[in-house]
Amino acid sequence: MSANQEEDKKPGDGGAHINLKVKGQDGNEVFFRIKRSTQLKKLMNAYCDRQSVDMNSIAFLFDGRRLRAEQTPDELDMEDGDEIDAMLHQTGGSGGGATA
């Protein structure tokens, strides 16, 4: 076992890590392993860095509900192997319909 793996295994932290899959609109899947107590913004930032997109242009959804960056897997009762959807924000339209 490497020193890195030993750091992840602490006595009494049974199941402190969780494996999550982030699936993009294009079907691309990225896998992450984070602590259950880690805020999801860490995962969101890592996903956006890998995809070279701005975090503000992506909506992350779990069970159809939008995720907030400060939430944790524990708060959301996420289980190992759960899937998060990463959807590109739809922007556009007439620009707000300004009136004179």
From Swiss-Prot:
Source taxon at top rank: Eukaryota
Alphabetic keyword roster: Cytoplasm, Isopeptide bond, Nucleus, Ubl conjugation pathway
**Similarity comment: family membership:** Belongs to the ubiquitin family. SUMO subfamily.
Q: Which gene encodes it?
A: SUMO1
All residue ranges annotated as the Ubiquitin-like domain in the record: 16-93
Protein name, per record: Small ubiquitin-related modifier 1
Supply the InterPro entries for this chain: Rad60/SUMO-like_dom (IPR022617), Ubiquitin-like_dom (IPR000626), Ubiquitin-like_domsf (IPR029071)
What functional role does this protein have? Ubiquitin-like protein which can be covalently attached to target lysines as a monomer. Does not seem to be involved in protein degradation and may function as an antagonist of ubiquitin in the degradation process. Required for the massive protein sumoylation in the nucleus induced by heat shock and controlled by SIZ1. Involved in the regulation of the heat stress transcription factor HSFA2 in acquired thermotolerance.
Positions of the region Disordered? 1-21
Q: What happens when the gene is disrupted?
A: No visible phenotype.
Q: Which PROSITE patterns does UniProt cross-reference here? A: UBIQUITIN_2
Q: Using the UniProt entry, state the residues involved in the cross-link Glycyl lysine isopeptide (Gly-Lys) (interchain with K-? in acceptor proteins), renumbered to this chain.
A: 93
Output the SMART domains linked to this UniProt entry: UBQ
